[in-house]
């Protein structure tokens, strides 16, 4: 088990940082939307864009992953997520924010798929459950830390 963790520690560290950023983004966007005067329905639509992106990303990203590989998909999805966060600062509009939340959800779906498939490749039948439980602890712990 220790060997499997040592070969994937960078993946876990990256996941921890990404999850913390995601948790922070949820809190800050909701607060900033209220401060900007978005009504509750607009704020709800903005925040639900993330889950629409997760849904579409979970369907589309595996096809992209099969054609270009783990590293390229992870890099592209990280870049999309980073750009989406920055666009929130530039535009103070619910429709633009909804599109960026969709992009964030899409890219996070991609990063989660890459992480999970990488872990499944590295795991043996004996270590798979332990690695995936560490993955979930890291993911949810990072989100909690970000909030």
Regions found by a protein language model. Give the residues of each.
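Paired small-residue
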Residues: 95-103
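Residue-level signature of mid-helix packing/kink "hotspots" within the transmembrane helices
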Residues: 51-59, 143-144
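Helix-breaking motifs and short loop linkers at transmembrane-helix boundaries and internal kinks
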Residues: 69, 90-93
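Intracellular juxtamembrane helix-capping segments at the cytosolic ends
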Residues: 29, 110-123
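Helix-to-loop junctions at the C-terminal end of transmembrane segments
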Residues: 57-69
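Helix-loop boundary and gating motifs at the non-cytosolic
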Residues: 6-51
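Structural signature of the two symmetry-related core transmembrane helices
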Residues: 72-86
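Core transmembrane helices of Major Facilitator Superfamily
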Residues: 22, 103-115
């Amino acid at each position: 088990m220790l060997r499997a963790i040592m070969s994937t520690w960078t993946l876990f560290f990256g996941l921890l940082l990404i999850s913390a950023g995601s948790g922070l983004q949820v809190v800050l966007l909701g607060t900033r939307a209220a401060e900007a005067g978005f009504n509750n329905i607009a704020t709800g639509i903005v925040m639900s864009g993330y889950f629409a992106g997760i849904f579409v990303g979970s369907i589309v990203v595996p096809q992209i992953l099969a054609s270009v590989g783990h590293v390229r998909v992870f890099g592209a999805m990280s870049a999309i997520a980073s750009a989406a966060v920055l666009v929130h600062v530039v535009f103070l509009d619910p429709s633009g924010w909804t599109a960026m939340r969709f992009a964030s959800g899409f890219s996070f779906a991609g990063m989660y798929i890459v992480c999970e498939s990488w872990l499944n490749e590295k795991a043996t039948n004996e270590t798979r459950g332990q690695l995936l439980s560490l993955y979930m602890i890291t993911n949810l712990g990072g989100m909690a830390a970000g909030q």
